[in-house]
């Protein structure tokens, strides 16, 4: 019992969100937290994968009531989320589960979230990584952000003995025996065979994870310390693999382990090698340096009038957008297109100016779509919705900013406006409201493939939220010279982040600026009439 309680004593008197499914591990962790005099908040996720899953939710609710613990329960159709996002069910369940735990922590002011992963879970994770050919078998980390996993070294036998000593029952989830799920197959069919020949297999795999985590941390530090032009021929491959991984991730590229191996080996030997990554982006190693291939810019897939010319940019090129006329060079700069690639971007140009810019997605001059029979601009329409929300905010005497989130298919899945004044809360920005609504709609914290459309360039707080949510693209109207995080004050995306969204600025910029200007003029007039406003 001391093995179970010892890591929990530091949390005495503290609010701790604990994920409780009803299974033995999580029920034991809840009981142990109560015994250690912590203040547990029970968070349960009903995955809606079984017809009687609501019975588990009620059972967990009753247990929390008996123990006097706060309780929250959420039902999410995990299978539907998986189908919608292109994930497998196990991955979707994990992502949704941690979002539910994080939400509960925010609601209850908890700085710690605990899960009841045990030595068995760790062993299965390491074995799964080995079978998948993962380069580093680090397994499940004991600490990640606010999440703590105090029982990664605890065998299942100790947990069951603890529950039996308490006379505490638990629930058995039938899906844990469904071998169509990889982890269930490993648990029910593979691990028993290994344990029969190697009785200490769980502890051995757990040791592998712990040592691998220590090694990986040291090697990642060495990789990060490599300067761009330092010779690579004497750098260990283990360090080079991590350096390549860091560079590809910072560029927002997708890849698999074999591609990292090829690039790292080429860096060390000095040979020239080209690798096409997932998604078609090319990477070349020459002279030990990593070079990303230039993008393949899209050409027009439609017919255009005879007086339009297909060419690349020239000095002075301008395009008339719904929000006003802008230099093409400024548009390409806002899109974060590297300087050495801007002269390769195709344009359609008439005597009146640039009509079309060949980036993804295409940028059209005002009225140009109708000339060639193309459908309405999705971003223009979305910005119109955001402007409507900004005007609502202005009427409510809030800072007039509105935002919407477009799902992968282009449908609006979240919207919001500023409510900071009404709520006396400076985190009530339009972007955060729209992101919250979108995550609730999709049932996950990650908005992969989604676009955030906002009338005013985001501040650092809202940009940070978009980065955490893995938003694929940020579109804004007016620049923000007082708090803009995308160039208005500082371009925070110029630093190296794990995920960098594409950025499009200036969409209906004049309309967005007009809403701001009119609102602030009205506010100044009210203050002149009544200084207390």
From Swiss-Prot:
CDD domains in the record: nucleoside_deaminase, TilS_N
Database matches in InterPro entries: CMP_dCMP_dom, Cytidine_deaminase-like, Lysidine-tRNA-synth_C, Rossmann-like_a/b/a_fold, TilS/TtcA_N, tRNA_aden_deaminase, tRNA_Ile_lys_synt, tRNA_Ile_lys_synt_N
TM spans (from-to): none
Record's subcellular location: Cytoplasm
EC top class named in words: ligase
GO biological process: tRNA wobble adenosine to inosine editing
Domain CMP/dCMP-type deaminase as annotated: residue spans: 377-500
Pfam families documented for this protein: ATP_bind_3, MafB19-deam, TilS_C
GO molecular function: ATP binding; tRNA(Ile)-lysidine synthase activity; tRNA-specific adenosine-34 deaminase activity; zinc ion binding
Documented EC number(s): 6.3.4.19
Known catalytic reactions: cytidine(34) in tRNA(Ile2) + L-lysine + ATP = lysidine(34) in tRNA(Ile2) + AMP + diphosphate + H(+)
UniProt entry keywords in alphabetical sequence: ATP-binding, Cytoplasm, Ligase, Nucleotide-binding, tRNA processing
Domain of life: Bacteria
GO cellular component: cytoplasm
Residues at which ATP binds: 21-26
PROSITE patterns xrefs: CYT_DCMP_DEAMINASES_2
Domain remarks in the Swiss-Prot or TrEMBL record: The N-terminal region contains the highly conserved SGGXDS motif, predicted to be a P-loop motif involved in ATP binding.
Family the entry assigns: Belongs to the tRNA(Ile)-lysidine synthase family.
Function: Ligates lysine onto the cytidine present at position 34 of the AUA codon-specific tRNA(Ile) that contains the anticodon CAU, in an ATP-dependent manner. Cytidine is converted to lysidine, thus changing the amino acid specificity of the tRNA from methionine to isoleucine.
HAMAP family per record: tRNA_aden_deaminase (MF_00972), tRNA_Ile_lys_synt (MF_01161)
Protein name: tRNA(Ile)-lysidine synthase
Organism: Deinococcus deserti (strain DSM 17065 / CIP 109153 / LMG 22923 / VCD115)
